[in-house]
Structures are given as structure tokens and as C-alpha cells.
Amino acid sequence: MFPVELDNVTVAYHKKPVLQDISLQVPEGKLIGIIGPNGAGKSTLIKTILGLVPRASGDISIYGKDYKDQRTRIGYVPQRGSVDWDFPTSPLDVVLMGRYGRIGLLKRPKKADVEMAKAALTKVGMHDYAKRQISQLSGGQQQRVFLARALCQNADIYFMDEPFAGVDAATERAIMTLLAELKEKGKTVLVVHHDLQTAEDYFDWILLLHLRKIAFGPTENVFTIENLQKTYGGRLTFLKDKVLAEGHKE
């Protein structure tokens, strides 16, 4: 039984396919990068798995069941730009939202939930900012808060939509440390990622996506010049650098 399984999933906006015939069996305990050009359907794929975007056809299962039956096993970090950061709330309150899937929306968090939220903020270096207004934080700090919320969900599968976008180098390192720790705990982590320069170092599995699945598997097998050309059309300077680098290895 796979953490995530897709069988011939197609998604269309206004009858135009944006994802077509996607079939995947996501292995457990892997750190997986979802990579492709702008408009390739990377964020749409995550949102479709989470039931946020309807699919035109195909089947999706989480540990063999429907997403609705497995919500407590899933953590989600959306794109930072999709969040209303002017909403009057504190980092601690945001992180506590990660507990509501388990305690229920209408129940007050218990002391143990609050302590877990504080521990998650400490984990991402944001304990001292717990009571500030979320709008007063920098982009990197806001992203750390969302990561802390995901930690508080204590999930088995984590979906992260461009967690490195617009963050400073220190925050990027902190995020990668956190992702590595989740993997060590046997968690399955799927990350939408844009930076091809870091992809080989960051992920042990990669999904190359451009409306269709181009390739999916261990990074050393998938992240090849041929597959990148299929995904990006050979337009990237990175491909030239990779060709030169691989030429030097021979």
C-alpha cells in the first residue's frame, strides 16, 4: 500500500487539460521533488491530491483510502503568496491550527496542544515571535511559521508548495534540515521546487512534470539531460552546464 497513488488522473480548467493521465505510486519515507517549468501543473497536482481542485477523471488514494478518510495523516504547506498575511493573528495561533484536524474545530486546544505548538515554533527558530502579529514577520519567518504548523499536524505525508520561494539562505538551510529530519522519521515528503541547481542535492526521488509525467523515480535515474530536455525543451542554461559537468566526468 502506497502513501499516495494516482491512476490516470486528468485535471482540466475550462475543458483544457492542465494535467493529463498522471499515474504515480509514491513510495514511503522518501523526500520527493516535484519539478517542471512554470505552468507545468506542479501546484495543481498537489491541490488535486488534497481535494482542493476537482479532477476530470482518474482515481487518487492515500494509503489505499479516499483523502477525506485520511486527513489527519496529511500536512500541507501552501504557497506563501496564497495566504492573507494581514489577517490579525499570531504565529502561535497559526501553528495551533495544525492541531484542529485531530482535536476538532469546535474544541479548545488543551495544554498539551499549546505545548506542542510552542515546541514546533522553537524547532523552526520562531519561539521568540510567538505572540507577534503574523503580518509583522518577514517572508522567511512567515514560511517558518507555516512549517511549524505542519509539524504540529504530526502527519505521515507532507505536501509543500514552493517552501523555498522568497526565503533567505538561513531559512532555506533550516527548511532542508527539517525535511531531512522528517525523512529520517519515515515520513513521506513531496515538495514543489523550482531550483534545478539544488534539486540533486535536496531530493532522493524526483517527479519531472510538464502537463504529463515525464519521469518519476530515484534522482540519479530521473535527473538526466534527456529527461530535463523533455521537460523544459532544452531551453535552460542549466542543461548546458550539466552537459559540460557530465562531460568532465567521462
UniProtKB/Swiss-Prot annotation:
GO biological process: monoatomic ion transport
One Pfam family this sequence matches: ABC_tran
GO molecular function: ATP binding; ATP hydrolysis activity; ATPase-coupled transmembrane transporter activity
Keyword check for Transmembrane: no
Membrane is among the record's keywords: yes
Domain ABC transporter: 4-236
Topology class, membrane: Peripheral membrane protein
Expression induction or repression: Repressed by MntR in the presence of manganese.
Location within or outside the cell: Cell membrane
Membrane-traversing stretches: none
Family: Belongs to the ABC transporter superfamily.
Quaternary state and interactors: The complex is probably composed of two ATP-binding proteins (MntB), two transmembrane proteins (MntC and MntD) and a solute-binding protein (MntA).
Function: Probably part of the ABC transporter complex MntABCD involved in manganese import. Probably responsible for energy coupling to the transport system.
Name the record gives this protein: Manganese transport system ATP-binding protein MntB
Origin species: Bacillus subtilis (strain 168)
